[in-house]
């Protein structure tokens, strides 16, 4: 190998190193972007989990309150009073069933 061939080989090797370094820098930037995105998503996920637990607690309270309200209305109805919008608070004659009250009590 003469000096020119050696120099050309060294120059090619140097160019390959520069291309490799450029590719490594590109991959490094992509990894940095992915890490940042991952961090943002982890924070967002944590906030969503907190919000979900608050909503679940509110829903549980609402269901409990709804159940208590329904039981209260059922008690009033069983005591012989209307609970429907049409006759609310009026005594049911001879404790006859009222279709409006029944519908209100047993709707989903």
Swiss-Prot record:
GO cellular component, one term: nucleoid
GO biological processes: DNA replication
Cofactor note: Binds 1 zinc ion per subunit.
Signal peptide from the UniProt entry: none
Cofactors (names): Zn(2+)
Oligomer status and interactors: Homotetramer. Interacts with both DnaA and DnaN, acting as a bridge between these two proteins.
Protein name from the UniProt record: Replication initiation control protein YabA
Gene that specifies this protein: yabA
